[in-house]
Design a protein with these regions (language model features):
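Class I S-adenosyl-L-methionine-dependent methyltransferase catalytic core
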Residues: 1-123
């Protein structure tokens, strides 16, 4: 059973980003009409080799709602727009910057993406 109390906290927000990560696709990372979801809540700071030189990089993932995009905790038809930008990487090192920044697809990635699309259409 889904948590229907979450619908009370939507406050007119009609955009749902189900895989927000560090919100890199957003110009306004605190858009007032959006709710940001992710399965992670973490801050990563480290030195990763770049094409120019070694540099310190920071990745901050702080979603409004911590959840899995394959099982969203919102009632059906709650949003007008759902943003779905899932991980694209299948093979990447455990500590690689790209993995920290964008996540990684698991072995069941086909089923995961299928279920994610289904949930995005539902909400």
């Amino acid at each position: 059973m889904r948590d229907t109390n979450l619908v009370n906290g939507l406050d007119g927000k009609k955009i749902l980003d189900v895989t927000c990560g560090s919100r890199t696709i957003w110009f306004d990372k605190q858009h007032p009409a959006a709710i940001y979801c992710d399965v992670r809540d973490e801050e990563c700071v480290g030195v990763w080799k770049s094409t120019n030189r070694d540099s310190e990089r920071t990745c901050i993932v702080h979603p409004d709602v911590l959840c899995d995009f394959t099982d969203l905790p919102f009632p059906s038809n709650s949003f007008s727009l759902v943003v779905f930008d899932p991980p694209h990487l299948r093979r990447v090192g455990e500590n690689a910057w790209m993995r920290k920044k964008y996540g990684q697809l698991g072995g069941n990635w086909r089923e995961m993406l299928h279920d994610g699309f289904r949930e995005g259409m539902r909400v």
